[in-house]
Amino acid sequence: MAATLHDVARVAGVSFKTVSNVINNHPHVRDTTRAKVEKAIAELDYRPNLTARSLRSGHTGAVTLALPQLSLPYFAELADAVIEAAAKHGLVVLIEQTGADRKRELEVMASPRLKMSDGLIFSPLALGQEDADLIKADVPIVLLGERIFGSTSDHVTMQNVPAARAATEHLLDLGRKRIAVVGAHEGEVIGSAGLRLRGYKEALEGRGIPYDDGIVAYVVDWHRSNGAAAMHDLLDRGASFDAVFGLNDTLAQGAVRVLQEAGFRVPGDVAVIGFDDLDETRYTLPTLSTVDPGRSEIAETAIRMLLERIKEPAGTPPREVETAFRVVPRESTVGSAAAGSHPSPTGQ
């Protein structure tokens, strides 16, 4: 059984009120008394009851972040950004991993564990637009991502279509004409893959280049292995291309590996760009050109909006914010000499 405040008071030989004063860092506690209480807390491995604390103050000082998969680098780096943004406001972050499973995504909004936090930052992957009416919980919610629009919750998202268009235009500006896509999802319209493919198509249309589905590789997941398998498929089919747009960085990394193994020079023979600006893309060989979708801004905006909603739950109608983006040219498109100096479009 977990230790209680009364247990701590008994072991320390002080009153319940004194233990409470120590835990809440009240100034008027003698050093010797504080030391006795802290020793008792350590001996009993006492953990504060966030639910009880919330009943007293109305707030727990914690927020929940629900993500599909921390094994995907983008979500791991997003979690880090949210934790950093929350810490600036004295908040702790509780992590829920849904596994991109519809049942678990629904459960996270109804979980008793939400009573341990003041709000939920939620990035669904299995739920879709048809589930917009199901986005509700007993605490304020801020949605992330591109699966659901128009719910009753605040929403922070990236500019997928303009950013993908800018990434494709970067390749076109370098003289590339046959740009393969790695990472499309069959039949998807709303969602990161569908929106980024739309941006790619818009860039081609703007330059009068016909869309060719024969150089679009469809996948189920967005891991390096999927990017590698998709590139193997393109090469095995004899597809002709001089550039690749990986719809995320891990897909692009898998594609680059297969291209190099097949004897292609990157970017000499095939230029490659990804999307997400993962930290590791600065250290790949070659370094990977990519799109920075504004991950830190997403995290900071989500925390700010959640705090505003916690303070005034019905203060304003649901808000939707799109973060800025920028194309980051590196060696995989412009070569080592030009990397870092090439102009980059920015979404405002």
Q: Which residues does each predicted region cover?
A:
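Amphipathic helical "hinge" segments at domain boundaries
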Residues: A35, Y46-S111, K115-G119, E186, ...
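Flexible loop/turn connectors
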Residues: H232, D236-A243, N248-Q348
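Hinge/beta->alpha junction and helix N-cap segments in small-molecule ligand-binding domains
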Residues: P68-E77, I95-R104, V156-A166, V182-A230, ...
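Periplasmic-binding protein-like
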Residues: M116-P124, A180-G183, A217, G238-N248, ...
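Flexible loop/hinge segments that line or gate small-molecule binding clefts
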Residues: S123-A166, E186, I209-P210, T250, ...
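N-terminal helix-turn-helix DNA-binding module of bacterial transcription factors
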Residues: M1-G61, A337-Q348
